[in-house]
């Protein structure tokens, strides 16, 4: 009730609680106390029962007779003095597992089977384990007054050894050593071999064959294809008995006259006239020269294609094709003053250029020029005017309309540049973002647009276009990932390019000597690897 009063004081502000709930709580507490009292009473009764049970068990242990040993065990012990006929009767009664406990053990069972015993030897008893010692029982007055009426067993004789041969090292062992277990060292160290080596012997003639394992006096048998060699135990024993049984024997296969290589007709020499049209370039590693001479020769080769024809316009064997090609190259030169290094890349590969240094200078060489239809079209560089330099955004839009190729934007000196300040109005940021997107689209390669469907800008037409004031900046799916970069460097590169940084600046911000980038460059194919212009061409 004290607890109930405390509860009432604690929850006094719950005025709407009815009195029935307190009556219910009181009944629950009374039931719990009654259960506790009954549990204590049951524990006391259980302890009394356990004490009575322990006393009864002690009394029963005093009265219980000791279990005598089984008659089979008794017969086993008495079989030491019994004759052989009694042993055989005992064996017939019992099972194999009780007689031979070690039957599953292969080593023990093999020795037991091979051991031939005398008829008087107690074989049956020797294979059995000794009887277990009886547990000491509590002394009782009855045991002292009247002893048990059990027949006394005769004292056991000491057990004889089952294998007495193991102790005597002079005698020959019961199990002979296997034929294949003999080691060469034992044979060499034996006294018989030493005696044989001392006696003078005539040298035996050894067979000439490299792999022959036959004896010298044995006749060489010719192989017969109609008769198969004997297989089975006979052949195995004959191989095992020989001294050189493990050496490989050379197989004599009869050579058939039809398939012999000596009788094959000589094929006519292959006609090489068809292959003379195609010249395969010799790799530079064939010539045994130093690396410095190789590099000099490669420099001569690169200059010879583009400039040698301009220096010698009047060569003896110069054809109309070479003169027209030199004229075409002279016309193109003023338009591209800085493209001299790029000229010999676009020329058709000439395999004869490598051997020009060995020939005399008086001879003229015919170098195949690339046809005009296959040459790359070059668009002259448009230098922006001063008006366009003033407004950078107009210049970027104008270049995007005029040309499709990648252009170089020439910026004025930093003193002439005007500081570009981005206004806070929404329209100025939209123009800046659109210019960035246009510049990134121009850098994109045409091949990546066709092959990669993910590069196509995605337009969601179902939702309709958003209003001009809420247009977000779309992520540049159209930006091509730079070649030779790993995944982490590519993500970092895209992060810098989306911020509006130029490609070169974004490249400079990437970590140097990245191991993953080097691995990616090793496993990537160069862009012009499968270009047919660089493959060997006919003369």
Curated annotation (Swiss-Prot):
Keywords: Glycoprotein, Immunity, Inflammatory response, Secreted
Cellular component per GO, a single term: extracellular region
UniProt keyword Glycoprotein, yes or no: yes
Signal peptide residue numbers: none
Glycosylation sites: 31, 90, 102, 149, 167, 217, 271, 288, 427, 503
Compartments where located: Secreted
Single GO biological process annotation from the record: immune system process
Predominant place of localization: secreted
Further details from the record: Laboratory mice bitten by Anopheles gambiae mosquitoes develop IgG antibodies against AgSAP. Sera from individuals living in an area where malaria is endemic (Senegal) have higher IgG reactivity to AgSAP than sera from individuals living in an area where malaria is absent (Marseille, France). Mice immunized with AgSAP and exposed to infectious mosquito bites exhibit a significantly lower Plasmodium berghei burden in the liver.
Protein name: Sporozoite-associated protein
Organism, scientific name: Anopheles gambiae (African malaria mosquito)
């Amino acid at each position: 009730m004290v607890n109930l009063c405390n509860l009432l004081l604690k929850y006094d502000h719950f005025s709407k609680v009815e009195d029935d709930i307190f009556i219910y709580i009181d009944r629950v507490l009374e039931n719990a106390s009654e259960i506790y009292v009954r549990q204590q009473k049951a524990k006391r009764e259980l302890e009394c029962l356990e004490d009575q049970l322990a006393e009864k068990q002690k009394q029963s242990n005093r009265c219980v007779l000791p279990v005598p040993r089984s008659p089979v065990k008794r017969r086993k012990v008495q079989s030491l003095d019994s004759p052989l006929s009694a042993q055989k009767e005992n064996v017939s009664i019992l099972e194999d597992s009780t007689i031979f406990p070690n039957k599953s053990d292969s080593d023990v069972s093999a020795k037991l089977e091979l051991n031939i015993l005398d008829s008087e030897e107690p074989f049956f008893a020797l294979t059995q384990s000794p009887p277990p010692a009886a547990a000491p029982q509590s002394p009782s007055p009855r045991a002292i007054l009247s002893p048990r009426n059990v027949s006394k067993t005769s004292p056991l004789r000491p057990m004889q050894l089952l294998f007495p041969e193991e102790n005597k090292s002079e005698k020959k062992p019961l199990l002979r050593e296997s034929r294949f277990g003999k080691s060469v060292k034992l044979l060499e160290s034996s006294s018989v071999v030493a005696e044989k080596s001392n006696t003078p012997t005539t040298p035996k003639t050894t067979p000439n064959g490299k792999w022959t394992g036959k004896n010298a006096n044995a006749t060489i048998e010719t192989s017969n294809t109609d008769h198969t060699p004997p297989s089975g135990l006979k052949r195995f024993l004959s191989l095992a008995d020989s001294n050189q049984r493990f050496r490989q024997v050379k197989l004599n296969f009869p050579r058939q006259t039809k398939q012999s290589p000596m009788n094959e007709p000589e094929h006519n020499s292959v006609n090489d006239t068809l292959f003379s049209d195609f010249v395969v370039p010799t790799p530079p590693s064939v010539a045994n020269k130093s690396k410095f001479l190789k590099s000099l020769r490669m420099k001569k080769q690169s200059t010879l294609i583009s400039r040698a024809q301009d220096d010698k316009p009047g060569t003896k064997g110069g054809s109309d094709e070479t003169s027209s090609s030199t004229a075409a190259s002279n016309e193109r030169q003023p338009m591209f003053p800085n493209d001299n290094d790029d000229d010999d890349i676009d020329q058709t590969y000439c395999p004869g250029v490598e051997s020009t240094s060995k020939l005399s200078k008086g001879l003229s060489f015919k170098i195949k020029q690339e046809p005009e239809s296959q040459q790359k079209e070059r668009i002259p560089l448009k230098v922006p005017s001063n008006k366009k330099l003033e407004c950078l955004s107009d210049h970027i839009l104008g270049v995007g309309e005029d040309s499709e190729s990648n252009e170089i934007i020439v910026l004025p000196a930093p003193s002439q540049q005007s500081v570009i300040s981005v206004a806070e109005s929404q329209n100025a940021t939209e123009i800046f973002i659109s210019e960035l997107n246009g510049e990134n689209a121009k850098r994109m390669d045409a091949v990546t647009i066709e092959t990669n469907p993910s590069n196509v800008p995605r337009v969601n037409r179902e939702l309709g276009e958003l209003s001009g004031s809420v247009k977000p900046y779309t992520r540049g799916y159209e930006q091509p990932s730079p070649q030779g970069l790993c995944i982490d460097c590519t993500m970092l590169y895209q992060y810098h390019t989306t911020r509006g940084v130029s490609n070169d600046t974004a490249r400079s911000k990437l970590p140097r000597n990245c191991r993953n980038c080097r691995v990616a460059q090793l496993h990537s194919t160069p862009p012009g690897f499968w270009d047919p212009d660089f493959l060997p061409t006919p003369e």
